[in-house]
């Protein structure tokens, strides 16, 4: 984590996503997409961190990320996902869901498909039509699931004009994020601190399971599923707390970890190294959580001059039966169970809205209109 | 009224005819609205077709520049860092910190300038290109002024080092020499290049004597005839005493050596050693600080402050800061020679050389089209404790006044408002009220944006604004029929009145549809239920339904009764509650005890006796009354039957 490149881009960044690598590829990530918000004109942009020739003195590649192409986006970009190598799905504050297609030959983006009234308060066709922001989108080729402030869940299929399935009034409050649990199940988080699991095989508008934080009904803003253990889920809340859930048992989180001082906007397990977790927050911080057990020898290497904290799980309410196979995120043994936290950004000011990790690369975007990229996460 | 510092500039709005029609205008925080009215100036009755547009006139146009946004964002971080510099730090460490901050600001300006330059070159439209070029020159002037202020006010260089700093300053800003040098050295025969002597002269003018010597040696190689005098000139250049940063010699020593060297130069001039080469002779005159010879190089000097620094270098290298203003004024006069009048930039630099900080800031405020520069420079100088004595006759001090102006400009921008918040935070007197006024006016199109605004308010304990934002969101949600959301927002705002209103909507929906919506929320109210009586009732009433559903009849019955006896239930809802009691009364086993049944009866009688008597009755009313009367009759019957059963049961239980 020596070099982290910052670039000011004259737009507040709401989402960043790495382009997925082709299966079996040995390359490292080199292209990512960003979406902006709260500008007079918002854009979806593609950036490349590919080498531009200049070898620096240490033999590494010097230079920051370069803009490949961009396209106007109507409304704030609320969420962004790569559908496949070429297609990007964007959720808009206007309630519209758009699929953009990247043409690598002439470096342009175009609109491939659009569901203009995916989310709304008063229906299209009615004279008092009012749209509702689409807050989250998740893709699992060929399916696209979107959620919104209207509490609606849509299931789209690429190349289908209409929604395949819509659950109206799925939630009485705002749905903030969605993720696939295991097909055809999805998991949503809402603004009153609940996780709901929906099974598309079931008819009706009821979730198959509800999990919730007790008491305070703290809104949850983000959710990510463990890449290998599909029952382990991490969520981030308005109070900056990180919660780890085991959806197979109990209706309460397995552990609650005191983290940021303000809203946690995104949480991501590292896709290929899930002992590592990354979070970012409104308080302007970006954290790297390391739950791999060999902490002592690593610590000397890792936190030179950076603020590092050790913590142990504060609340645990799970009786562990099969300790050996369980993920370190669920373990409750206080001796083994230590997490090292490293703060990745040098000085904190405005909100870090988004982050994404792929291989050794991390990208994040802020309200201070900067995009930070590092290519050496585990150096 | 305060005297005007200059004629205000006239901005013409295309399409608006102020000659014929009266104008209407209104001030906003950073903008002004202008439109034509249909009133005529001369009261003629004919209607002149007026302009159909309302114009928004922005004062702080630079805020809207895409490239300058980077300047605003990047400098915001530096600004925050500066505010956090420990007040305890004193002396050297504090000064070096402040100099570092100043350099950071300047490097951001330079980065912006370079990017703007690239864009100006790449611009396809010439008008666009011109606009960018003019921006580049503005940025370059800002950096020039800032750098000088850094040397004079922050670094506070003493005699000796002062001149070295000024030389660096000139070298940094008169940089054509580098491309010229590359051009000359790249040619086949440098000393025969057209600009060879120009280059050598510029190098001497900038005090880059080592480089000048190397150039001279090329001339010596090329023409053996002048090799001798070139070597003499080279030796003079090499021996010129200068203060180097690592040197420990005192100023007096330096002055002595310098005097000695100066006399040596003088001798060569009198001996006419360089008479054969006019170029070398003019170089010698320059090195003697001859004003006439210097002024001959006006073209190469390009501006008066270069002239000033060169003049000082070769006539008074150990100039004291307090003497600067004398040399500055006379250099300006000599350089312009009465041919042209000084421009705003000249006046600003002159004011800086006079150590008149307030004049610098004032002139900059008038000359520059944005508040960024003055706000940040003033703030930095204030941290150097240079501005404390100065108070304005309005508002608070100058630093705060300028920061407020700048931050208000940011708030007028649709997306830079977040930066403005931190600037307001560091305005101790009026920052808070300004923030309060601005933050409420931010349009909230998504909940996410609302959450960000709320976080800003909550961090600063701005309870009034928090309540108002939550209320706006709750209202929006009600309008969109999102009752769950509305209730969440009113709970967050701790707005009891609104929570009551939303709870009523829930209850009304229940009465109409016979089932509750948004159970996920109502079932999880927890302690938030206590916010308002109506909300408590809603929560408890739903609990009753849940108990009933779970067939916990006894618990359900006593909860239902307590809702009425404790007066939590609104009277208008009592009939519904009593109706809900009907199935419980009709259960096979006795649920309401005799005591409870009496209570229920009292409630029913209470309700019916206080019913308003309808004077006039239409058919619909009558029909309603009919249903109502039937209901009451049924209730009375059930209650009586239940009472009978309860008395028997209780009597027999006691008996057994």
Curated annotation (Swiss-Prot), chain B:
The modification N-acetylmethionine is found at residue 1. The modification N6-acetyllysine is found at residue 92. This is Nuclear pore complex protein Nup85. Belongs to the nucleoporin Nup85 family. It is linked to Nephrotic syndrome 17: A form of nephrotic syndrome, a renal disease clinically characterized by severe proteinuria, resulting in complications such as hypoalbuminemia, hyperlipidemia and edema. Kidney biopsies show non-specific histologic changes such as focal segmental glomerulosclerosis and diffuse mesangial proliferation. Some affected individuals have an inherited steroid-resistant form that progresses to end-stage renal failure. NPHS17 is an autosomal recessive, steroid-resistant progressive form with onset in the first decade of life. Keywords: Acetylation, Centromere, Chromosome, Cytoplasm, Cytoskeleton, Disease variant, Kinetochore, Membrane, mRNA transport, Nuclear pore complex, Nucleus, Phosphoprotein, Protein transport, Translocation, Transport. InterPro entries: Nucleoporin_Nup85. The modification Phosphoserine is found at residue 223. One of its GO terms (biological process) is lamellipodium assembly. Changing residue 581 to P: In NPHS17; decreased function in nephrogenesis; unable to fully rescue morpholino-induced nephrogenesis defects in Xenopus; decreased interaction with NUP160. It is found in: Nucleus, Nuclear pore complex; Chromosome, Centromere, Kinetochore; Cytoplasm, Cytoskeleton, Spindle; Cytoplasm. Essential component of the nuclear pore complex (NPC) that seems to be required for NPC assembly and maintenance. As part of the NPC Nup107-160 subcomplex plays a role in RNA export and in tethering NUP96/Nup98 and NUP153 to the nucleus. The Nup107-160 complex seems to be required for spindle assembly during mitosis. NUP85 is required for membrane clustering of CCL2-activated CCR2. Seems to be involved in CCR2-mediated chemotaxis of monocytes and may link activated CCR2 to the phosphatidyl-inositol 3-kinase-Rac-lammellipodium protrusion cascade. Involved in nephrogenesis. Changing residue 645 to W: In NPHS17; loss of function in nephrogenesis; unable to rescue morpholino-induced nephrogenesis defects in Xenopus; decreased interaction with NUP160. Component of the nuclear pore complex (NPC). Component of the NPC Nup107-160 subcomplex, consisting of at least NUP107, NUP98/Nup96, NUP160, NUP133, NUP85, NUP37, NUP43 and SEC13. Interacts with NUP160, NUP133 and SEC13. Interacts with NUP37, NUP107 and NUP43. Interacts with CCR2. It comes from Homo sapiens (Human). GO terms for cellular component: actin cytoskeleton; ciliary basal body; cytosol; intracellular membrane-bounded organelle; kinetochore; membrane; nuclear envelope; nuclear membrane. Coiled coil: none annotated. GO terms for molecular function: structural constituent of nuclear pore.
């Amino acid at each position: 984590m020596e070099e982290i490149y910052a670039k000011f881009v004259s737009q507040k960044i709401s989402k960043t996503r790495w382009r997925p690598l082709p299966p079996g590829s040995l390359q490292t990530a080199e292209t990512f997409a960003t979406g902006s918000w709260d500008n007079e004109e918002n854009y979806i942009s593609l950036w490349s961190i590919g080498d531009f020739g200049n070898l620096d003195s240490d033999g590494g590649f010097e230079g920051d990320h370069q803009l490949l192409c961009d396209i106007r986006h109507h409304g704030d970009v609320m969420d962004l996902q790569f559908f496949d190598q070429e297609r990007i799905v964007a959720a808009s504050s206007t309630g519209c869901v758009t699929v953009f297609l990247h043409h690598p030959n002439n470096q342009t983006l175009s609109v491939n498909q659009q569901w203009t009234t995916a989310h709304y308060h008063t229906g299209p066709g009615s004279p008092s039509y009012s749209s509702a922001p689409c807050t989250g989108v998740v893709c699992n080729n060929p399916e696209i699931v979107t959620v919104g402030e209207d509490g609606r869940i849509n299931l789209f299929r690429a190349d289908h004009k209409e929604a395949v399935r819509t659950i109206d009034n799925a939630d009485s409050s705002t749905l903030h994020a969605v993720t696939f649990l295991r097909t055809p199940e999805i998991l949503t988080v809402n603004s009153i601190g609940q996780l709901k699991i929906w099974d598309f095989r079931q008819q009706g508008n009821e979730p198959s399971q509800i999990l919730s934080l007790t008491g305070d009904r703290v809104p949850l803003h983000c959710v990510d599923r463990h890449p290998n253990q599909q029952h382990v889920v991490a969520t981030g809340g308005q109070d900056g707390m990180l919660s780890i859930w085991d959806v197979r048992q109990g209706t309460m989180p397995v552990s609650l970890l005191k983290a940021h001082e303000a809203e946690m906007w995104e949480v991501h397990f590292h896709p290929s190294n899930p002992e590592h977790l990354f979070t970012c927050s409104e308080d302007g911080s970006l954290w790297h959580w390391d739950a791999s057990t060999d902490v002592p020898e690593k610590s000397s290497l890792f936190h030179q001059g950076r603020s590092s904290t050790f913590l142990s799980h504060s609340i645990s309410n799970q009786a562990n039966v099969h300790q050996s196979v369980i993920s370190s995120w669920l373990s409750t043994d206080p001796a083994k169970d230590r997490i090292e936290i490293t703060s990745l950004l040098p000085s904190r000011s405005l909100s870090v809205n988004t982050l994404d990790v792929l291989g050794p690369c991390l990208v994040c975007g802020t309200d201070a209109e900067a995009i930070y990229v590092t290519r050496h996460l585990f150096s | 009224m305060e005297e005007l510092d200059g004629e205000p500039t006239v901005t013409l709005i295309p399409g608006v005819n102020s000659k014929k029609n009266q104008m209407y205008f209104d001030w906003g925080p950073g903008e002004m609205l202008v439109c034509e009215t249909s009133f005529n100036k001369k009261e003629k009755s004919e209607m002149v077709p007026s302009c159909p547009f309302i114009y928004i006139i922005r004062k702080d146009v630079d805020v809207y520049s895409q490239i300058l946004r980077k300047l605003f964002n990047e400098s915001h971080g530096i600004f925050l860092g500066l505010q956090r510099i420990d007040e305890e730090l004193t002396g050297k460490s504090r000064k070096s910190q402040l100099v570092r901050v100043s350099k950071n600001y300047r490097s951001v300006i330079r980065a912006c300038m370079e990017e703007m330059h690239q864009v100006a070159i790449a611009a396809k439209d010439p008008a666009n290109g011109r606009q960018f070029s003019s921006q580049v020159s503005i940025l370059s002037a800002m950096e020039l002024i800032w750098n000088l202020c850094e040397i004079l006010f922050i670094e506070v260089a003493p005699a000796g080092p002062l001149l070295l700093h000024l030389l660096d300053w000139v070298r940094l800003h008169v940089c054509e020499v580098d491309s010229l040098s590359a051009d000359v050295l790249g040619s086949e025969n440098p000393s025969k290049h057209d600009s060879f002597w120009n280059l050598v002269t510029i190098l001497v003018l900038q005090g880059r004597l080592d480089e000048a010597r190397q150039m001279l040696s090329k001339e010596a190689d090329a023409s053996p005839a002048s090799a001798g005098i070139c070597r003499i000139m080279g030796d003079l250049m090499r021996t010129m005493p200068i203060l180097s940063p690592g040197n420990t010699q005192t100023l007096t020593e330096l002055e002595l050596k310098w005097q000695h060297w100066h006399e040596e130069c003088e001798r060569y001039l009198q001996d006419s050693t360089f008479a054969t080469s006019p170029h070398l002779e003019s170089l010698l005159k320059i090195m003697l600080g001859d004003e006439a010879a210097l002024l001959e190089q006006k073209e190469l000097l390009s501006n008066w402050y270069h002239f000033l620094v060169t003049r000082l270098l070769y006539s008074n290298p150990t100039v004291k800061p307090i003497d600067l203003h004398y040399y500055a004024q006379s250099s300006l006069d000599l350089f312009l020679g009465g041919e042209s009048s000084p421009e705003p930039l000249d006046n600003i630099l002159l004011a800086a050389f006079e150590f008149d900080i307030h004049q610098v800031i004032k002139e900059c405020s008038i000359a520059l089209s944005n508040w960024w520069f003055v706000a940040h420079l003033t703030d930095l100088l204030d941290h150097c404790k240079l501005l404390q004595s100065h108070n304005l006759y309005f508002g608070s001090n100058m630093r705060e006044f300028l920061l407020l102006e700048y931050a208000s400009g940011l708030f007028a921008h649709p997306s830079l408002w977040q930066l403005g918040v931190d600037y307001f935070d560091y305005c101790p007197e009026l920052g808070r009220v300004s923030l309060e006024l601005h933050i409420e006016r931010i349009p909230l199109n998504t909940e996410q944006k609302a959450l960000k605004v709320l976080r800003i308010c909550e961090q600063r304990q701005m309870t009034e604004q928090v309540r108002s934002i939550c209320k706006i969101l709750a209202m929006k949600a009600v309008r969109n029929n999102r009752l769950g959301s509305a209730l969440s927002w009113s709970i967050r705002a701790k707005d009891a009145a609104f929570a009551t209103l939303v709870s009523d909507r829930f209850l009304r929906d229940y009465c109409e549809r016979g089932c509750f919506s948004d159970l996920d929320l109502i079932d999880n109210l927890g302690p938030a239920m206590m916010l308002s009586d109506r909300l408590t009732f809603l929560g408890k009433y739903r609990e009753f339904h849940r108990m009933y559903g779970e067939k916990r009849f006894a618990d359900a019955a006593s909860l239902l009764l307590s809702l009425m006896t404790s007066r939590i239930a609104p009277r208008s809802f009592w009939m519904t509650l009593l109706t809900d009691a009907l199935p419980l009364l009709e259960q096979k086993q006795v649920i309401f005890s005799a005591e409870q049944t009496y209570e229920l009866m009292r409630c029913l009688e209470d309700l019916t006796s206080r019913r308003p008597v309808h004077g006039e009755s239409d058919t619909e009313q009558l029909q309603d009354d009919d249903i109502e009367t039937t209901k009451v009759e049924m209730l009375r019957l059930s209650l009586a039957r239940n009472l009978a059963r309860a008395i028997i049961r209780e009597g027999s239980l006691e008996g057994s």
